[in-house]
């Protein structure tokens, strides 16, 4: 209810804007009396594009109606009687309005709540001490609104001038008719006697001279009025062009740029409501001026007076038609982009919207929108107005949709919910270009009739570039193409040109944005992380980020050529890091438990002076998406150890926290945080003992060289430690792998956890053996439940 309390404190223009949000579609009284209930409902949890959420929307509608009915029943007394009737009427009205379209109720209330919050936020910013210095964005919006007020006043002025011209011309025509009547009277003078004729003729001549003098003077006045009106319209159109340029070429383009960066994980592009309100104001003022110009043309045709006005009016009429054409075609936009990595035979969605649909009555004859997929070359030809003969580069199913007008929000949009790319036709590739570097775009096109079919516009808009894949394995490289395009595309480019090289700081910004979005973390890439990445990319050892600021990164370096000495590209390695964090380690990254971006030598330097049992987690150089444990432990042979990397597959079997919990000689997370303090909350609870006569096996992470160390450390027993061992045959009988710790340690200091050592397979084989002939006194063969790397599926 706090939101409604704040909304009631709005004043002036903000209060008027809030009042406009309400009407028959949702009365303000309902908002007032059900404020607490409305603000406590999960309106944002419903996906308006998902038909499966209709049931939840219906429940909210029913709940709203029930709450209104209850509120009505509780009204007593004389004052409560009228309110009871009114609330009951609103309950019936809302039920009838939204019964068949409950999603529209959700859309309406979300629209109201969003704008209420925006108005309250803007009011608070202006009234707070910090709001005295209005930020640049608010200042710009203020200037736009001031220009609209100026345009409104000018348009009202030309309306008054037009009315004055019309009244003056009507009186002129009356007097002109009087002049014609006098001329007719001259023709009738011959029927009078000479004395009467002379007397009458003198009076008529005096009247005619006086009237003709007046007509000449008034004709000049009319011409002057017409010229002045045309000149005022010229000035109005100049201001309109300037305002439209600010809104369409600045604000709308900035929104589209934010939408593009949001594809890389940037902040959401924001609501279109403010932009739509500006575009609607533009449309309203443009249309008013167009009607004025046409009325002025009609007056000139009604009473032709030689002069420059006809040419002036023809010019302003052509200009205002160009202005309205630019407005309509530019405000046909893609509100929800199709996925930029588009897999064939997979359902996808998109939403297009016309920001001026309501004001220009386009919705009175709902237009149909068609979607087709075209190549980069076809997009270039389209923008050059070359004849593409309706060419396309593939077939999209369910690619036609009728635009719908939502009365509550005033939006005209088409929701493509079930499109699917059936097939794709690729162009011949250039040089080293792969299929995941080829860009397409979804073309949306329609035809709009404006002003009772006075004007008809063919409108088209292109989606952000999409990369088409046919298999999930292509997703990572396709994402690299999209990331580079979204990050470094320049305004007004030829489709879909991007720089082949960018500065390292530019790439850092794009990587950090993508990283935080993928990992869903506010903990982005630090200066040290970026230095590590620069060292990896440029194969340089400098530890100063500034040394890399002037260095350029080419697309080939980013994701075409392998890194020196490795069989993967820079992007593939970085993408693997994001994937393993996203799937398995988001909480650990957010806790700061994963240091990550350090190499083996850096890990050595960090751990060398730390107490035994101190460890850190870093991203592997040798395994894409791998995480390895480096730790300090003094022994006769060495004091620093590295475990062979774990990958996503390993963490799907046993979590990182549980693996660390198994290794009791790992005590401190670098630099000095107790391991259990960091990871204990993520340990899997110990299973209860079996009660059905069966023993449940459990995997335990063990490094053979440290079995004694683990025992000496006083490890708490796991379930497998506590459970009685199953009766097994002697090791030679089953050809089990003998304990052989020597190969586990590789020559450069990493444990090589043999992939062939699959404990799960042997456990399953063992449990399938007949047990009758086995000696119950025999214990499991050595090494059966211990291995440096174990898995149980």
From Swiss-Prot:
Ranges where the SH2 domain occurs: 589-686
Keywords associated with the record: Activator, Cytoplasm, DNA-binding, Lactation, Nucleus, Phosphoprotein, SH2 domain, Transcription, Transcription regulation, Ubl conjugation
One Pfam family from the record: STAT_int
Keyword Ubl conjugation attached: yes
One GO term describing the cellular component: cytoplasm
UniProt keyword Phosphoprotein, yes or no: yes
Purpose: Carries out a dual function: signal transduction and activation of transcription. Mediates cellular responses to the cytokine KITLG/SCF and other growth factors. May mediate cellular responses to activated FGFR1, FGFR2, FGFR3 and FGFR4. Binds to the GAS element and activates PRL-induced transcription. Regulates the expression of milk proteins during lactation.
Protein name: Signal transducer and activator of transcription 5A
GO molecular function, one term: sequence-specific DNA binding
Membrane-crossing segments per the record: none
Family as reported in the entry's similarity comment: Belongs to the transcription factor STAT family.
Modification type Phosphotyrosine: residues: 90, 682, 694
Coiled coil: none
Quaternary structure, from the entry: Forms a homodimer or a heterodimer with a related family member. Interacts with NCOA1 and SOCS7. Binds NR3C1. Interacts with ERBB4. Interacts with EBF4. Interacts with CD69.
Subcellular location(s) per record: Cytoplasm; Nucleus
GO terms under biological process: activated T cell proliferation; B cell differentiation; cell population proliferation; cell surface receptor signaling pathway via JAK-STAT; cellular response to cytokine stimulus; cellular response to granulocyte macrophage colony-stimulating factor stimulus; cytokine-mediated signaling pathway; development of secondary female sexual characteristics
Lineage: superkingdom: Eukaryota
Gene3D superfamilies to which the protein is assigned, alphabetical: EF-hand, SH2 domain, STAT transcription factor, all-alpha domain, STAT transcription factor, DNA-binding domain, STAT transcription factor, N-terminal domain
Location (main, coarse): cytoplasm
Post-translational modification Phosphoserine, affected residues: 128, 779
Modification(s) after translation: ISGylated.
Tissue and organ expression note: In the virgin, found in most tissues except brain and muscle. During lactation, abundantly found in mammary tissue, as well as in other secretory organs such as salivary gland and seminal vesicle.
């Amino acid at each position: 209810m706090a939101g409604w309390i704040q909304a009631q404190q709005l004043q002036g223009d903000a209060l008027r804007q809030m009042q406009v949000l309400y009407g028959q579609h949702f009365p303000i009284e309902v908002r007032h009396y059900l404020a607490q209930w409305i603000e406590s409902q999960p309106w944002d949890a419903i996906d308006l594009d998902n038909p499966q959420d209709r049931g939840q929307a219906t429940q909210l509608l029913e709940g709203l109606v029930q709450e209104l009915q209850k509120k009505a029943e509780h009204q007593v007394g004389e004052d409560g009687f009228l309110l009871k009737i009114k609330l009951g009427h609103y309950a019936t009205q809302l039920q009838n309005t939204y019964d068949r379209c409950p999603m529209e109720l959700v859309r309406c209330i979300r629209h109201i709540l969003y704008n209420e919050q925006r108005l309250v936020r803007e009011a608070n910013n202006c009234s707070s001490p910090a709001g005295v210095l209005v930020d640049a964005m608010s200042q710009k919006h203020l200037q736009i609104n001031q220009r609209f007020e100026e345009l409104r006043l000018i348009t009202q002025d030309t309306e008054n001038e037009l009315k004055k011209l019309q009244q003056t011309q009507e009186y002129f025509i009356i007097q002109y008719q009087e002049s014609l009547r006098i001329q007719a009277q001259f023709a009738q003078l011959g029927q009078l006697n000479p004395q009467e004729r002379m007397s009458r003729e003198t009076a008529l001549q005096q009247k005619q001279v006086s009237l003709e003098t007046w007509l000449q003077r008034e004709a000049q006045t009319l011409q002057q009025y017409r010229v002045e009106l045309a000149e005022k319209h010229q000035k109005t159109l100049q201001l309109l062009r300037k305002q439209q340029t600010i809104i369409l070429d600045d604000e709308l383009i900035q929104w589209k740029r934010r939408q593009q960066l949001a594809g890389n994980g940037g902040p959401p592009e924001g609501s279109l409501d403010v932009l739509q309100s500006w575009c609607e104001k533009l449309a309203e003022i443009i249309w008013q001026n167009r009607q004025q110009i046409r009325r002025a043309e009609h007056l000139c045709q009604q009473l032709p007076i030689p002069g420059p006005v006809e040419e002036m009016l023809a010019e302003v009429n052509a200009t205002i038609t160009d202005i309205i054409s630019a407005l309509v075609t530019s405000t046909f936009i893609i509100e929800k982009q199709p996925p930029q990595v588009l897999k064939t035979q997979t359902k996808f969605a998109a939403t297009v919207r016309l920001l001026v649909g309501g004001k220009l009555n386009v919705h009175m004859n709902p237009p149909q929108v068609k979607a087709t997929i075209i190549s980069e070359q076809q997009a270039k030809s389209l923008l050059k107005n070359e004849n593409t003969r309706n060419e396309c580069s593939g077939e999209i199913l369910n690619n036609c949709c009728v635009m719908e007008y939502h009365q509550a929000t005033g939006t005209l949009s088409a929701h493509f919910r079930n499109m699917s790319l059936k097939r794709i036709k690729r162009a011949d590739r250039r040089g080293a270009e792969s299929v995941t570097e080829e860009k397409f775009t979804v073309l949306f096109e329609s035809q709009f009739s404006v002003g009772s079919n006075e004007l008809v516009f063919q409108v088209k808009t292109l989606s952000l570039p999409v990369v088409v894949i046919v298999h999930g394995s292509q997703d990572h490289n396709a994402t690299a193409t999209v990331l580079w395009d979204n990050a470094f595309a320049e305004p007004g480019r030829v489709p879909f040109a991007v720089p082949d090289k960018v500065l390292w700081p530019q790439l850092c910004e794009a990587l950090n944005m993508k990283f935080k979005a993928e990992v869903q973390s506010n903990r982005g890439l630090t200066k040290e992380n970026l230095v590590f990445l620069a060292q990896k990319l440029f194969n340089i050892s400098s530890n100063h980020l500034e040394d890399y600021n002037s260095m350029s990164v080419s697309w080939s370096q980013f994701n075409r050529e392998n890194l020196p000495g490795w069989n993967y590209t820079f992007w593939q390695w970085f993408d693997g890091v994001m994937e393993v964090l996203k799937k398995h380690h988001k909480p650990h990254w957010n806790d700061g438990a994963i240091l990550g971006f350090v190499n083996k030598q850096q890990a050595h330097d960090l751990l060398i002076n730390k107490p035994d049992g101190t460890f850190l987690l870093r991203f592997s150089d040798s395994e894409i998406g791998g995480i390895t444990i480096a730790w300090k432990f003094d022994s006769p042979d060495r004091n620093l150890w590295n475990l062979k990397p774990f990958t996503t597959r390993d963490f799907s079997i046993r979590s990182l926290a549980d693996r660390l919990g198994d290794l009791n000689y790992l005590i401190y997370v670098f630099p000095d945080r107790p391991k259990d303090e960091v990871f204990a909350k993520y340990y899997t609870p110990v299973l209860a003992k079996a009660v059905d006569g069966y023993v449940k096996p459990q995997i335990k992470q063990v490094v053979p060289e440290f079995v004694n160390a683990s025992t000496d450390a006083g490890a708490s027993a796991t379930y497998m430690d506590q459970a009685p061992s199953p009766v097994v045959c002697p090791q030679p009988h089953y050809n089990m792998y003998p304990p052989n710790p020597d190969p586990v340690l590789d020559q450069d200091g990493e444990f090589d956890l043999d992939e062939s050592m699959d404990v799960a397979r042997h456990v399953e084989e063992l449990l399938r053996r007949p047990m009758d002939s086995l000696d119950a006194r025999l214990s499991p063969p050595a090494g059966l439940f211990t291995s440096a790397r174990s898995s149980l599926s």
